[in-house]
């Protein structure tokens, strides 16, 4: 592998930090607000890289991928990375529209370069388009099944390319750097990011109409007045206090075994009504009197037994029992 010149070293010093920012965006380790200063710095660095690449004439329009030196292959990713950085730059809706347009231009330029180098052979959708409006209005609508199939195929291809990239990197770490393996790694990365750009361009096309509508409403608020809030009449609930057993039973129910079904008064009125004549009459007064006399006799016997027990305790003190062999 040939040694790097001073110009290539300065290129690499600007390119590598920007590539690190792209890796952090892909990994999702940092939040988007934390990455904003680094994204802006990465855009500035890659713009300088673009100027240096043009001054050094690393690429020409009449060559194929086999003619590009191995050391120059990574810089084919510069427009792709610029598109990713502009896409992730946080701005107001009006400025975001411009950032997405720049991102779209960079990503298309990246795919155009790969097609000119014959690295990809598929026909690009925008080759026959003249303006962005024509792209948004006259773009043929694909069926849902077709969109799903294309997404699955692209995702599968990305996974295969990512696995191939990891495999080549392990080979480069295990042995000394071989130019053939290094070139294969760069080609694999270019193919991976080409699939990624297809996905991001579709996402940008879906987002642009929404941002245009938001920007138009922000610039002409009187044309799009905000709809009045929907007023829904809600019936007012009157406060109430449970003061009677009937209301309490309506709330708590009657089936819980620990709560009585009715009060004594309710049971009495339900059973006998308000007529005292319906109350149960004693059918055997004589029996009641006999029971009372028996209770009195029992009380007299119990009283006499208690008196006899007291007299016994007076005559027989505690511990006076059998004193045999007690000294």
From Swiss-Prot:
This is Serine/threonine-protein phosphatase 4 regulatory subunit ppfr-4. Keywords: Coiled coil, Meiosis. Disruption phenotype: RNAi-mediated knockdown causes 94 percent embryonic lethality when injected compared to 20 percent when fed. Partially rescues embryonic lethality in gain of function mei-1 (ct46) mutant background. Probable regulatory subunit of serine/threonine-protein phosphatase PP4 which may play a role in meiosis and embryonic mitosis. Probably in association with catalytic subunit pph-4.1, regulates microtubule severing during oocyte meiosis II by dephosphorylating and likely activating mei-1, a component of the katanin microtubule severing complex. It holds the Pfam family TAP42. InterPro entries: TAP42/TAP46-like_sf, TAP46-like. Residues 275-284 have a biased composition (Polar residues). Serine/threonine-protein phosphatase 4 (PP4) occurs in different assemblies of the catalytic and one or more regulatory subunits. The catalytic subunit is likely to be pph-4.1. GO terms for molecular function: protein phosphatase 2A binding; protein phosphatase regulator activity. Residues 141-185 form a coiled coil. GO terms for cellular component: cytosol. The keyword Coiled coil applies. Residues 271-327 are annotated as: Disordered. One of its GO terms (biological process) is embryo development ending in birth or egg hatching. Residues 302-318 have a biased composition (Basic and acidic residues). Signal peptide: none annotated. Residues 291-301 have a biased composition (Acidic residues).
């Amino acid at each position: 592998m040939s040694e790097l010149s001073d110009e290539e070293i300065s290129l690499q010093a600007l390119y590598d930090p920007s590539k690190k920012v792209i890796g952090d965006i892909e990994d999702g380790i940092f939040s988007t607000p934390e990455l904003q200063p680094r994204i802006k710095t990465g855009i500035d660095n890659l713009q300088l890289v673009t100027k240096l690449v043009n001054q050094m004439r690393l690429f020409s329009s009449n060559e194929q991928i086999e003619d590009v030196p191995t050391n120059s292959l990574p810089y084919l990713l510069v427009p792709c990375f610029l598109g990713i950085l502009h896409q992730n730059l946080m701005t107001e809706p009006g400025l975001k529209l411009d950032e997405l347009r720049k991102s779209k231009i960079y990503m298309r330029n990246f795919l155009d370069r790969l097609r000119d180098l014959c690295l990809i052979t598929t026909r690009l959708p925008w080759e026959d388009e003249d303006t962005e409006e024509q792209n948004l209005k006259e773009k043929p609508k694909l069926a849902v099944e077709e969109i799903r199939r294309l997404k699955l195929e692209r995702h599968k291809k990305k996974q295969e390319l990512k696995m191939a990239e990891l495999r080549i990197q392990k080979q480069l770490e295990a042995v000394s750097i071989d130019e053939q393996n290094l070139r294969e790694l760069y080609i694999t990365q270019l193919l991976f990011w080409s699939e990624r750009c297809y996905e991001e361009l579709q996402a940008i096309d879906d987002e642009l109409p929404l941002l245009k509508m938001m920007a138009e409403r922000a610039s002409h608020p009187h044309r799009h007045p905000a709809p009045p809030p929907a007023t829904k009449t809600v019936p007012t609930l009157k406060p109430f206090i449970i003061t009677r057993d009937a209301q309490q039973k309506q709330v708590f129910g009657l089936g819980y075994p620990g709560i009585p079904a009715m009060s004594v008064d309710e049971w009495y009125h339900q059973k006998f009504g308000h007529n005292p004549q319906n109350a149960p009459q004693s059918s055997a007064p004589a029996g009641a009197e006999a029971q009372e006399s028996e209770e009195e006799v029992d009380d007299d016997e119990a009283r006499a037994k208690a008196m006899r027990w007291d007299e016994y305790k007076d005559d027989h003190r505690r511990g006076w029992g059998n004193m045999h062999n007690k000294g």
